């Protein structure tokens, strides 16, 4: 197959305005192509979200490609140089919402699978795709429920490649072999509302909160490790008061987030926060939300297969990294021992005029195909 096979498919996907959670039949298009080469396709839908599980083969090892057909909203369309849902070739790039995140990865893997199956129709092991329309949104009815279903069935995943756009300066320079965890908190500090001229008759929760926050932001939570940077604590929102300048507020709210490494656990972080707040004598309510645990795939069969494929195709020695935000890899890592993320350059993801370099489509497809060969055909 030629590079145009990937280009044609990604154009067809971009033309479908699949803003979370609407799939707009992207997965139906993928299933039709996959069924033609022997994949058994199943739709798992819940809460307005569409998920596709497609598998070819019954033996081990099972190599999975995971991705999402949903995209973020395009934002003001008048800021785009072309319609975000009309795929447009211009100056060596393909423009459109989802071009980089992550419809090109999906198209490249589907074509890679077609080429691989055509060359090796009796290949050992199994290939599967796990595609959701709920990655950019709440992510509660997407990959996580498919993983739960696969666990209940006893399906054993061995390797998973998540097609997130991980490259930075050039295709293949960075892969993600892990991600930090995310832990958020909503802290409500209770005070006593009153007149600013009579502070002795009030209790200002902002004044009480400020020194506690100052201490929290100065803490070194851990030192990280060889795979992860140190855990970070960031305050994202502060709110107090009525808008009037002569009223002491009755309560103050702070929202904060940890991005944490495997050097700390959620329970350890929570305990240290509570210790600080209690020591400062605050009357408070603290609600926690664990967005995801950190995961890590040490060097092994999957990292070697992908890094080797990248080097063979591009000449680059890919860096293994754990930086960045969370992804659906956090759900897959619960049922799959080796998970890695790899895809095109991410400089324009979620931005106006999102784009991918046209010349990267064929190499991306070839890297995915070579990785399948390295994993499934190795002696």
Curated annotation (Swiss-Prot):
Under the heading SUPFAM superfamilies, the entry gives:
Bacterial exopeptidase dimerisation domain, Zn-dependent exopeptidases
Highest taxon, organism lineage: Bacteria
Q: Which species is listed as the source?
A: Bordetella parapertussis (strain 12822 / ATCC BAA-587 / NCTC 13253)
Q: Which CDD domains match?
A: M20_DapE_proteobac (cd03891)
The subunit field of the Swiss-Prot or TrEMBL record says: Homodimer.
State the InterPro entries in the record: Bact_exopeptidase_dim_dom (IPR036264), DapE_proteobac (IPR005941), Peptidase_M20 (IPR002933), Peptidase_M20_dimer (IPR011650), Peptidase_M20A (IPR050072)
Q: In which pathway does it act?
A: Amino-acid biosynthesis; L-lysine biosynthesis via DAP pathway; LL-2,6-diaminopimelate from (S)-tetrahydrodipicolinate (succinylase route): step 3/3
Any transmembrane segments, and where?
A: none
Any one of the GO BP annotations: diaminopimelate biosynthetic process
Q: What protein name does the entry list?
A: Succinyl-diaminopimelate desuccinylase
Co-factor binding comment: Binds 2 Zn(2+) or Co(2+) ions per subunit.
Task: Look at the named UniProt entry and state the broad enzyme category this protein falls under.
Answer: hydrolase
Q: Where along the chain is the active site annotated?
A: 70, 135
Ligand binding (Zn(2+) 1):
68, 101, 164
Function statement: Catalyzes the hydrolysis of N-succinyl-L,L-diaminopimelic acid (SDAP), forming succinate and LL-2,6-diaminopimelate (DAP), an intermediate involved in the bacterial biosynthesis of lysine and meso-diaminopimelic acid, an essential component of bacterial cell walls.
Does Amino-acid biosynthesis show up as a keyword for this record? yes
Q: Which gene encodes it?
A: dapE
Listed GO molecular functions?
A: acetylornithine deacetylase activity; cobalt ion binding; succinyl-diaminopimelate desuccinylase activity; zinc ion binding
